[in-house]
Structures are given as structure tokens and as C-alpha cells.
Amino acid sequence: GYASTDFAVWSEEILAVLLLLMFASGCVGSTSGGLKLMRWIVGVKVIGRELFQMIHPSSVRPMWLGRRAVKEPVVRGILIVILTYLLLVVGGTGFIAVDAHRVGIDLSISEALSGTLVVLGNIGPGFGAVGPMGGFEALPVPTKLFMCLLMVAGRLEVMTFLVVLTPSYWTG
């Protein structure tokens, strides 16, 4: 494929920033996969609200995005999507690292994490073996198939993908 630069020559600090940006994904309405920035904003606001309520237990603070109040069921749904996404990232990273190790491929956790984020968020090249100077061809077939599932999950939105996998969706 085409590559504009080799991430291996970049500093670890820059790669850490890129890894964090991979989590950020796109804005609402964009065609990017992964978690949208609005969900991260709500998640951070929930943490702030909960910390405030720990200090002031009797306080009631509604969630606001701009000038609009966000209802609690919506906040709860966003938190479920964030948690599900993070579980997929952790599980995907573990699966990719273990499966690569099983066949003798030396894949670091950061490479497995970037590979997971790349396919789940439809982002672009990852780091190291799954980076611009590498590719996915060296990965074992089960890993490639799993990454295909992660790619579909990220593109369709995580919850939509999981709903389609439930038996009750197909039976009635």
C-alpha cells in the first residue's frame, strides 16, 4: 500500500498522543467509525457530575450539552455504548495479541491496541506490524476474521452490531 511516513521513527510521546486521538474518532454526523466526540464529552461530564455529587450528595444537576438538557435515559445509553466500546477494545487487543503470539508473531500490546482501534474506528494505519510500513498480511487468519468483525462493529456502531447478533432480533 501507500505510506507517507514510518511511525517507527516517531517518538513514543507522539505515538501516545496518536493512540489517544484514535479513541476520539469523529464528530456526530461523520462517517467515521468508533465513538463520536459527543459521547466522550457526555462521559467526561458524567464523571464531573458524579464527583460533584460525592461532595454535595443532595445536589441535583441535569446534564447539558450546549443549551439542551440531556435526559437520563440518553445519558445511560451513552455510558453503555462507551463501556461496550471499551470492552471491545480490551477484548480485541487481548485476542489479537494472544492469537499473534500463538503463531509466533512478535506483536506488542501497543501494536495490538492500535490494530484494534484502527479496525474498530476505521481510522487508517496502526503502529509497528500493523502500521504503514507493515500490514495485516502477516497476522493469522483467525485474527483477520476477528478484525473484520470489529471493523463491521465500528462502522455500524457497536450497539447496532450487537443487536443484530442477538437471537431475539432474528426470531421475532
What positions do the PLM features span?
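Membrane-proximal intracellular helices of multi-pass ion channels
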Residues: 1-172
